[in-house]
Amino acid sequence: MSKQLPQDFVMGGATAAYQVEGATKEDGKGRVLWDDFLDKQGRFKPDPAADFYHRYDEDLALAEKYGHQVIRVSIAWSRIFPDGAGEVEPRGVAFYHKLFADCAAHHIEPFVTLHHFDTPERLHEAGDWLSQEMLDDFVAYAKFCFEEFSEVKYWITINEPTSMAVQQYTTGTFPPAESGRFDKTFQAEHNQMVAHARIVNLYKSMQLGGQIGIVHALQTVYPYSDSAVDHHAAELQDALENRLYLDGTLAGEYHQETLALVKEILDANHQPMFQSTPQEMKAIDEAAHQLDFVGVNNYFSKWLRAYHGKSETIHNGDGTKGSSVARLQGVGEEKLPDGIETTDWDWSIYPRGMYDILMRIHNDYPLVPVTYVTENGIGLKESLPENATPDTVIEDPKRIDYVKKYLSAMADAIHDGANVKGYFIWSLQDQFSWTNGYSKRYGLFFVDFPTQNRYIKQSAEWFKSVSETHIIPD
């Protein structure tokens, strides 16, 4: 049966500066944590990505043509402050003014993220989110952006704090590529929430009239079996990846049960508890009571079973199905039940997880007034057909099927009371992936990276229909 979305529901595509812009050495842009890391790996480069730095008008024109009312973009901090602080690069400032003006020209509202995994290199070397200097410079950068880019009405402080901290210090897939350091993970998580809170409180004090939120990666965690030990493993995983953030940003405090689970993980790894101050917790509480919205990035769900060995993680970075391993000391082991479909990158396809996380926010965190689904989509191995012409439409039925199921689950959550106001598909166009390079394609628009030519995918036409009719077909 088809399902109806509210008439004021907005839809669009999502991007991130480092993944789409390219031009990493142009117009005075400073280096970021990824530049040296990717150079040393030698697997793939962030240039040209989707060359959005030069082709943003082409992509925004496509977005408008295919029914998008909104877009997620991020500001590359190192385009504004090449060193993270100090001298401003006017060419970077001018670029974002042009980008936002072009959004307006195409009748698309930008939701603008201040930090999307791209810490300036100097601040990364100073400790990244473990450094007080980083926090202070981030707040100063945010203040500059709020004053400079008054045309922006929707701000996002940080994209996926959990992904940043866990992949930097627990699984080691993001630079500095440390693993098993749960103490650093939780401290970085807390510090990100402090920075987020300071920025929310600053923005509200400036009375600029816009809205501000945060984006979380929220993958619903289920027990692998009905056993008590598997239920507890799921609770531990949830505390690591979801619960601490939800508490801090949406409740304004860390609930005692959450802290007990965090301490259990740290004790099992013989590592100390993260540090916080009363002043920091006051800022966190104040921000939670002023937050305008939360963004939910949901792609897959996890199932956890009890595990008592050493941590072992293998990241599936090339689409070899079944190659990923995730076992964390003091937490548990990820194990998919029989019958759960996965992508080539071992991400489960489980729309019920979308429903459950949206209802959890609605039921457990009533302070936040509005939710957006700020990322959802499926990465596929796709190629340009031989003899393709500019009019070629690339068939991607798997993407349509995936998005239809997740949109349907989201519509059910709206029906049951969740105040979800919009959906951003990941991604607008094919992009560069942090850990997969160019092999994993998410876009509604196919990018032939050697030529940078754009081609329409069938999913873009389907997306346009849903956006314009507000009806999710059978």
Curated annotation (Swiss-Prot):
HAMAP family to which the protein is assigned, alphabetical: LacG
Protein family membership: Belongs to the glycosyl hydrolase 1 family.
Molecular function as annotated in GO: 6-phospho-beta-galactosidase activity; beta-glucosidase activity
Leader sequence segment: none
Sequence positions that bind D-galactose 6-phosphate: Q19, H116, N159, E160, N297, S433, W434, K440, Y442
GO biological process: lactose catabolic process via tagatose-6-phosphate
Enzyme Commission number: 3.2.1.85
Stated name of the protein: 6-phospho-beta-galactosidase
PANTHER family associated with the record: GLYCOSYL HYDROLASE, LP05116P
The reaction(s) this protein catalyses: a 6-phospho-beta-D-galactoside + H2O = D-galactose 6-phosphate + an alcohol
Keywords on record: Glycosidase, Hydrolase
